[in-house]
From Swiss-Prot:
Chief localization: plastid
Lineage: Eukaryota, Viridiplantae, Streptophyta, Embryophyta, Tracheophyta
Protein name as annotated: Maturase K
Organism this protein belongs to: Nicotiana bigelovii (Bigelov's tobacco)
Alphabetic keyword roster: Chloroplast, mRNA processing, Plastid, RNA-binding, tRNA processing
Domain of life (superkingdom): Eukaryota
């Protein structure tokens, strides 16, 4: 009971963090206007005072200083007459949204740091490692090999802007900030301009991306946190009583009823959704829910999710947004990789006295491959090759120096090798490397008005060194004559924790 109360109870200190937009009033909307402030953001999160979290005094002084330099003020009474808007309407609306996003991100950052500090004996966990895209793959590699079915979910979007404001109402206790947010959303944008659904997942406009991503993540976080709580408590509650926990505002009035459910109805609890091997991952506007259970169980979860999100979070579900797939028979595009769980057959011979036995054993293995066709399509779109994969020159770079051209091609090659280092098979990467290297040679030959063969004879070693990856460079220095050592390294998978974004050439979509 105490665990449930701790989970759903809002931390008072976190509520207090949101009082400073009311204290600072209009000053907060100049916060994001200083380009150097984001680089020195730690000054807002460090305080030599009592709690070592943040300093109201430092923030107040910074905001006041920037406000005096910018000299602007919003007046909602004579909104149409105010010269603040005019031709710079988009510019100042972007300033407002970025300022609001910057302010509300601070308590969420503190909350993340405090939650991570509970790991490893109150030792501060390196949260930047969790930001890496590759940090998800070791989790999938360790867990998905033991699972059977997966729900591929395209996360829907809210049907009305007011839902986004209502979601923040649980955390932001400053009424003036919420009113300004509501006014801002309804004045400048409608839902179609906020979130576009032309492609799978979400596509935000380039303006105010930080603001929209915050609203979207806070909204999805609210859906996920309540859903995870209900999933964890599914073995203790009846399937008809979960609705009482969804309305956080009235939660404390229903605590006594919850105690009665635990005390009286435990013997007749329905175990419809009990599954200890359930894993959830969200990425790029999508999510996957994998289970070790049967098809019937995962199908129940499908209908449960649809009803849960539609009824209680007003999410708009369309046909085809959620699919059930068997892991052993299905490959999916996941963060630029083609991932699947395949059976790795092996044969074991056992001999007892004069009798021998052959035992066939199949082991599930999480497999990650480089999607060659989409990757060649990205190279063709960038004019490095044709759609069939034949290298061509890049005339746009012909005006650059030879060293700059070689450096650009080499950087693209190393970045692709770095991102796809977790691939089970590296043969595709060597084909991409061949395309980029020959495209570089054709570009240089075009610049010097010579043939590719002549240019490679003259500077072939320089091209070879520039296209070496970091692993190849280490091995070439350690084992200069043992070229076979490269094969052993590239047959293994390596996951890096310093990759925070996907380059267009590394994205399969």
């Amino acid at each position: 009971m105490e665990e449930i109360q701790r989970y759903l109870q809002l931390d008072r200190s976190q509520q207090h963090n949101f009082l400073y937009p009311l204290i600072f009033q209009e000053y907060i909307y100049a916060l994001a206007h200083d380009p150097g402030l984001n680089r020195n953001r730690s000054i807002l999160l460090e305080n030599p005072g009592s709690n070592n979290k943040f300093s109201f005094l430092i923030v107040k002084r910074l905001i006041t200083r920037m406000y005096q330099q910018n000299h602007f003020l919003i007046s909602t009474n004579d909104f149409n007459k105010n010269s603040f808007l005019g031709c710079n309407k988009n510019l100042y609306s972007q300033m407002i949204s970025e300022g609001f996003a910057f302010i509300v991100e601070i308590p969420f950052s503190l909350r993340l740091i405090s939650s991570l500090s509970s790991f490893e004996g109150k030792k501060i966990f390196k949260s930047h490692n969790l930001r890496s895209i590759h940090s998800t793959f070791p989790f999938l590699e360790d867990n998905f090999a033991h699972l059977n079915y997966v729900l591929d979910i395209l996360i829907p979007y809210p049907v009305h802007l007011e839902i986004l404001v209502q979601t923040l109402r649980y955390w932001v206790k400053d009424a003036s900030s919420l009113h300004l947010l509501r006014f801002f959303l309804h004045e400048y944008w409608n839902l179609n301009s906020l979130i576009t659904s032309k492609k799978p997942g979400y596509s935000f406009s380039k303006k105010n991306q930080r603001f929209f991503f915050f609203l979207y993540n806070s909204y999805v976080y609210e859906c996920e946190s309540t859903f995870v709580f209900l999933r964890n408590q599914s073995s203790h509650l009846r399937s008809t009583s979960f609705g009482a926990l969804l309305e956080r505002i009235f939660f404390y009035g229903k605590i006594e009823r919850l105690v009665e459910v635990f005390a009286k109805d435990f013997q007749v609890t329905l175990w419809l959704f009990k599954d200890p091997f359930m894993h959830y991952v969200r990425y790029q506007g999508k999510s996957i829910l994998a289970s070790k259970g049967t098809f019937l169980l995962i199908n129940k979860w499908k209908f449960y999710l649809v009803n849960f999100w539609q009824c209680h979070f007003s999410l708009c579900f369309h046909t085809g947004r959620i699919h059930i797939n068997q892991l052993s028979n299905h490959s999916r595009d996941f963060m630029g990789y083609l991932s699947s769980v395949r059976l790795n057959p092996s044969m074991v011979r056992s001999q007892m006295l004069e009798n021998s036995f052959l035992i066939n054993n199949a082991i599930k293995k999480f497999d990650t491959l480089v999607p060659i066709i989409p990757l060649i399509g990205s190279l063709a779109k960038a004019n490095f090759c044709t759609v069939l994969g034949h290298p061509i020159s890049k005339p746009v770079w012909s005006d650059l120096s030879d060293s700059d051209i070689i450096a650009r091609f080499g950087r693209i090659c190393r970045n692709l090798f770095h991102y796809y280092s977790g691939s089970s098979k590296k043969k595709t990467l060597y084909r991409i490397k061949y395309i980029l290297r020959l495209s570089c040679a054709r570009t240089l030959a075009r610049k010097h008005k010579s043939t590719v063969r002549t240019f490679l004879k003259r500077s072939g070693s320089e091209l070879l060194e520039e296209f070496l990856t970091s692993e190849e460079q280490v091995l070439s220095l350690t084992f200069p004559r043992a070229s076979s050592s490269l094969g052993g390294v590239y047959r293994s998978r390596i996951w890096y924790l310093d990759i925070f974004c996907i380059n267009d050439l590394a994205n399969s979509q």
